[in-house]
Amino acid sequence: MRPRITFRPLHGILLLDKPAGLSSNNALQAARRLLRAEKGGHTGSLDPLATGLLPLCFGEATKIAGLLLGSAKAYDADIVLGVTTDTDDADGQPLRERPVPALSEAALQAALAPFIGRIQQQAPIYSALKQGGEPLYAKARRGEVIEAPVREVEVHAITLTSYASPRLRLRVTCGSGTYIRSLARDLGEALGCGAHIAALRRVWVEPFRTPEMITLEALTALVESGADAAQLLLPVAAGLSDFAQITLDATLVARFRMGQRLRDPAFPEGQVAVFDTDGSPAGLGLVDADGRLSPQRLFNGLNAAAAC
């Protein structure tokens, strides 16, 4: 019988290198058990096939998980031309095979150009998007005919890093909600041969541009060695580095925490991270055009010296 785990309050962010074959939620739960963290959440699903950066938020850090979900991301995508699948990746069943035309680098670049910027993209039918309160993948697995939603997404940049027919590799930088599987599928159709994702790796998520990730295997080994894996957690403040910052004295922080609006013409307009003078994050707020700061999310039990 597995020993009962005693969970504890931990506050911070773990930069997990998700393995292939594991859902994002299963990866989160595995890490949460190893850390013995009471509360945890991830910052947006990676496909089971995908590997790479999955920021996991614990304790008070879960209050910014939604912000990280909406941030820019970068992927390395290995794409196979000439074969389509029902999932738009290598985990799916082949649907159709077509010959791959001779393609120069210039032809590929020209085909990629329309996919950069704000584009309309149809999600894969095997996706976690919900329709009628149910994930699309559940309907697809039952064999239902599905019309996946078309949404506007933003692709900031696409770099062709290698091509040896029928495989190519792309570095894609994009905004929230972009499906790289859909991008591969649509690129294949634009080339007239179809395509699917063979491998996908997320290399960074804003603001973690140069992440020092840890695998579940390394995390397990650390715990089994008797070390406290909580040392790996980044402080909540690490997830706030892209926000304009406001530092308030103890009196004003207390008023901010009570939900009072504060006004200062020097406050930068927009969403801001509010800190105490000792460097501890107090919360997130919104500053209007008149310099009025309104509390949005408050952090509890955090200090500047400890991540957890």
Curated annotation (Swiss-Prot):
Enzyme kind, highest EC tier: isomerase
Active-site residue numbers: 47 (nucleophile)
Biological process per Gene Ontology, one example term: mRNA pseudouridine synthesis
Keyword tRNA processing belongs to the record: yes
InterPro entries: PsdUridine_synth_cat_dom_sf, PsdUridine_synth_N, PUA-like_sf, PUA_sf, tRNA_psdUridine_synth_TruB, tRNA_sdUridine_synth_fam1_C, TruB_C
Membership in a protein family: Belongs to the pseudouridine synthase TruB family. Type 1 subfamily.
Name of the featured protein: tRNA pseudouridine synthase B
